[in-house]
Design a protein with these regions (language model features):
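A gly/proline- and charged-residue-enriched helix-loop-helix capping module
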Residues: 81-119
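Short beta-strand-to-loop capping motifs
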Residues: 91-94, 153-157
Length: 245
């Protein structure tokens, strides 16, 4: 077993092809999908450092990283840290089969060596501890601190029953549910159905302004400057206009 890697400073054709192909066989959330990442990249000026990790020439992981300057400090972080509720690597679904902790840490050390001349701090925030049925090595292998906890929706009944319960809720609750659901790869189809229920609630389209106001409140609670919300709004409006969500 041999690990190798390649670093992309932009989402060029090769990078996009690898990423697009990977989405069919890899585990990731909505925030690591290529169409969302591309919107983020278009609206920020951070330096991209997308790392593709190979095991015997087979892609097993994509690390969507960027270097952002905070005042005079260059920070390595996940792409979209300010906007995404979940910031994770993108791992192949058979990652466990190809994972060797020692090899992974060695290759990570080499990657960091390449970044070092322009890097002052590594800050990986909003990570999932477990991705599908395997542990996130960036949480498992390094010392981490819990800043806060969030709880995702757990569907304990058939979707039709759940949908009926949504009809009984007011529009505000429906928007909150929809906003949460669209974030997750596994719940894409469900999120579209929730979107239909919102339209049935006397609304012609998804109320982006309403969602943004709620997101701004989240950003405020995280002490993130309000100026970020305007970029967030632009990103999601573009996605909705293009019918990607």
């Amino acid at each position: 077993m041999k690990y190798s890697y390649k670093i992309f400073d932009s989402i060029d054709e090769e990078c996009k092809k690898i990423w697009t192909n990977a989405e069919n066989f890899f585990s990731c959330t909505f925030f690591q999908e290529i169409m969302f990442v591309e919107e983020l990249v278009e609206n920020t000026d951070n330096k991209l450092k997308i790392v593709v990790i190979f095991c015997d020439k087979k892609v097993i992981a994509i690390l969507p990283l960027e270097i952002k300057k905070y005042f005079f400090i260059n920070v390595l972080q996940w792409i979209g840290t300010e906007y995404a509720d979940y910031c994770n690597p993108v791992f192949s679904k058979d990652f466990n089969t190809n994972y060797d902790k020692k090899l992974f840490l060695n290759i990570w050390a080499k990657i960091i060596e390449e970044f070092k001349p322009n890097l002052d701090l590594i800050f990986f925030n909003n990570q999932l501890k477990k991705i599908d049925d395997f542990n996130n090595p960036f949480v498992e292998s390094f010392k981490t601190i819990n800043f806060s906890k969030i709880y995702s929706i757990d569907f304990k009944s058939e979707f039709n029953d759940y949908k009926e319960s949504i009809k009984k809720k007011d529009k505000k609750h429906a928007y909150e549910i929809h906003r949460t659901l669209i974030k997750y790869e596994k719940l894409k189809k469900i999120s579209k159905n929730i979107g239909i229920e919102i339209k049935d609630s006397n609304s012609d389209e998804l109320d982006i302004d309403k969602i943004i106001e709620e997101k701004k409140d989240q950003l405020y609670k995280k002490n993130i400057p309000n100026k970020l919300s305007s970029q967030f709004k632009k990103i999601f409006k573009n996605l909705v206009k293009s019918k990607k969500i």
